[in-house]
C-alpha cells in the first residue's frame, strides 16, 4: 500500500504532467526540455524562476475544485502594440497606470507615480538595450484575477509574492485595477532577466503559474483552486476578452458574426454541428476518470475518507461533463426556442455526432443572435485563457 506522502507526490507529478498517472511512468527528460526551458539557455525554466510548489498541491487543488471553490485566472494578452520594443512597453504602462493616475510598484517595492516617473523607468529600460521600435517582444503582460468580492488587499499581496518568486531575476512592475467586477492585477515583466536569459513560457509553465498563484492566495487567506478545465469536466472555453468587450458595448465582433452565420446555415439545413475533438475529449475523460478512481481508492485505504469522497465527487462531475461545443449548445438553444422544447445536454457518446433530425423551421437572424455564441476558431490576438 502506498504511503500518504507517496500518493501526494504521485498526484503532484500527474497533475503537472510529469508522469502518465498515479503510479505511472515518467514522461522523460525530453518532455521537460520542451515545456520548461529558457529560449537560448540550457538552464532555468521557461516560466521564469521560483522555488518548488509545496508538496501536496495536486490533491489540495483537486479537493478545492470538488468543493466548487473559485478558480484562479491568469491571462497573457497578445497585443504587439503593448509588448514590442520600448514603444510597446510605454503603451502598456500608460494603459495599466491609467495614463499615470495609478501608482505602479516595481520588483523592489518602490512606487512609480505619474508620467514623469514612468518616463524615468523607460529611460532605464532603454539603457538596458531595449530599442524604441524593436520588432521583438521585450515585455510580458500578465493579468491575474479573481471573482467579485475577493479581498483586494489580500489579492494584491498574493500577486506581489507570486511575482517575486516567479520572476525573481526579472524587472517588473505591477498595479491593481478595481474598476471592474473582477478585481485583478497587471504585471509588466521584462522578457530578459539579469543574466540575459529570455522568458519563453509554454503551456505547462502557464499552468504551473496558476498553481503558484493559488498557493500564494491561500497563504493570504483566500480559498481557491487551480485546475484545468478537463479536471472539472468542463470542455467549453470561456468567451475571449475582445469579443466579450465588444458585446458588452452593444457591438458585434467578427467572431460573433461568423458563428452566427454558421449557426444560421446549420439550422436552415437541419444539420447538427459536428464536434471535431470528440474522440480526443473522450480519451482525456477516460484517463482522468481512471486516475480519480485510483486516487480515491488509495485515500480510502489510508483512512482519508473525506478527501476520497471529494475526489469521487469530482470523478462523477467529469463523467457527466457536457462535451458539446459552443456551436452545438447554441444550436440546441435555437431549437428549443423554435419548438418550445427544453434544451437537453447530450451524453458523452457518439450520439453527439449523429443527433436525430427533427422538423426544420427556418430561423430568423434574431434567433441566431439570441444564442450568445462565444466560440472562436482563431484565437490569434485574443489572449490565452489558462
Task: Go through each PLM region and give its residues.
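N-terminal nicking endonuclease/strand-transfer module with a His-rich metal-binding environment
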Residues: 1-386
Amino acid at each position: 500500500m502506498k504511503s500518504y506522502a507517496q500518493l501526494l507526490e504521485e498526484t503532484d507529478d500527474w497533475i503537472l504532467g510529469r508522469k502518465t498517472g498515479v503510479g505511472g511512468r515518467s514522461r522523460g527528460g525530453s518532455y521537460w526540455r520542451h515545456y520548461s526551458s529558457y529560449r537560448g539557455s540550457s538552464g532555468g525554466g521557461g516560466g521564469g524562476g521560483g522555488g518548488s510548489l509545496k508538496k501536496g498541491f495536486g490533491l489540495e487543488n483537486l479537493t478545492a475544485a470538488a468543493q466548487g471553490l473559485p478558480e484562479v485566472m491568469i491571462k497573457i494578452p497578445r497585443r504587439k502594440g503593448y509588448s514590442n520594443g520600448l514603444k510597446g512597453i510605454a503603451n502598456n504602462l500608460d494603459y495599466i497606470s491609467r495614463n499615470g493616475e495609478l501608482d505602479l510598484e516595481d520588483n523592489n517595492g518602490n512606487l512609480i507615480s505619474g508620467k514623469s516617473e514612468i518616463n524615468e523607468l523607460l529611460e532605464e529600460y532603454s539603457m538596458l538595450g531595449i530599442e524604441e521600435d524593436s520588432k521583438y517582444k521585450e515585455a510580458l503582460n500578465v493579468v491575474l484575477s479573481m471573482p467579485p468580492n475577493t479581498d483586494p488587499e489580500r489579492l494584491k499581496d498574493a500577486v506581489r509574492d507570486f511575482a517575486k518568486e516567479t520572476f525573481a531575476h526579472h524587472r517588473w512592475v505591477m498595479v491593481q485595477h478595481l474598476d471592474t467586477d473582477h478585481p485583478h492585477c497587471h504585471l509588466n515583466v521584462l522578457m530578459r532577466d539579469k543574466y540575459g536569459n529570455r522568458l519563453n513560457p509554454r503551456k505547462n509553465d502557464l499552468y504551473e503559474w496558476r498553481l503558484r498563484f493559488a498557493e500564494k492566495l491561500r497563504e493570504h487567506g483566500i480559498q481557491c483552486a487551480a485546475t484545468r478545465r478537463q479536471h472539472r469536466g468542463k470542455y467549453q472555453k470561456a468567451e475571449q476578452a475582445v469579443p466579450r468587450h465588444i458585446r458588452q458595448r452593444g457591438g458585434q465582433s467578427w467572431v460573433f458574426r461568423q458563428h452566427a452565420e454558421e449557426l444560421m446555415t446549420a439550422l436552415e439545413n437541419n444539420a447538427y454541428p459536428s464536434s471535431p475533438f470528440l474522440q480526443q475529449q473522450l480519451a482525456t475523460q477516460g484517463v482522468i476518470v481512471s486516475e480519480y478512481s485510483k486516487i480515491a481508492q488509495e485515500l480510502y485505504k489510508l483512512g482519508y475518507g473525506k478527501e476520497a469522497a471529494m475526489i469521487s465527487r469530482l470523478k462523477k462531475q467529469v463523467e457527466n461533463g457536457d462535451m458539446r461545443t459552443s456551436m452545438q449548445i447554441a444550436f440546441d438553444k435555437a431549437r428549443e426556442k423554435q419548438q418550445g422544447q427544453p434544451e437537453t445536454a447530450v451524453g458523452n457518446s457518439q450520439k453527439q455526432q449523429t443527433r436525430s433530425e427533427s422538423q426544420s423551421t427556418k430561423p430568423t437572424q434574431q434567433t441566431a443572435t439570441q444564442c450568445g455564441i462565444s466560440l472562436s476558431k482563431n484565437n490569434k490576438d485574443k489572449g490565452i485563457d489558462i
